[in-house]
Every structure is written in C-alpha cells, then in structure tokens.
Amino acid sequence: MLQVYTGTGKGKTTAALGVALRASGYGMKTLMLSFLKDDPEYGEARAAKNLPWFTLRQVGRDAFVNFHNPDPVDLKMCRDGWEEAKKAISSHAADVIILDELNIVLATQMLPTQEVVDFLREHKNNVEVIT
C-alpha cells in the first residue's frame, strides 16, 4: 500500500507518525527515513530513542538545502537514502516505511521522479509505504 501526504504547511510528518503509532499497537515495526533532515533534537528523533518498534534514520544533513542549485553532498545523501529505502522495501525490513520529505526531494528534482514512481508501483504490495 502507498499513502502520499502532500501540501504546504504542517501535518504530513505528523500524519505519517500517527500511522506508525497505530501500527505499533498491533506489534508492527516502522522504519522512517527522513530525507533533508539530520538533527538529533527533532522531536521524532528524540522519541525514536524510546520506542523499540520505531527506527528513525536521518538521511539528510543539518544544513540549508538550495533546491535551485543543490550541493553535490545533498544529492549524494538523497541518492544514498533512496538506495536504503529500496533495500528496506524490497526486503520487508519493516511493516511500515515512512519516506519523510521524499515529495520535496522529487519536486526539486534531487532524485528522478519516474525511477521512484516505477519502483514504488512495482513493490506496492511489499509493505505500507508513506511519503
């Protein structure tokens, strides 16, 4: 299953975390890959340390990202994060996999949209994926 949360402002990450919380109530594991973020002080990063069913990997860096001219480091981190996501989805590493901020990565062409869409379509029955 694929769920896509879009729009401006707050609520997308919170909605995904709500699904993760509900899933944990049924004994399901969640993996959250957080693109464009790397700050251990984010609330979700702090909470993840106390939740054995919830794994958070921040696959971005704690720096401003120039979406019009992204730094090669940011592009590589997005690519590496996407490769990690593909492995997790393919291997069913968790019951719920949240790809936080992936929509921004795609909208700013930091990853090829068609590649991501094709992969997610091909693996839509593996796990529940939220972007």
Predicted regions and their residues:
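Residue-level preference for the first positions of well-ordered beta-strands
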Residues: M1-V4, L31, D95-V96, E128-I130
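Conserved P-loop
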Residues: L2-S90
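Phosphate-binding/switch loop-helix module in NTP-utilizing enzymes
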Residues: N66-E128
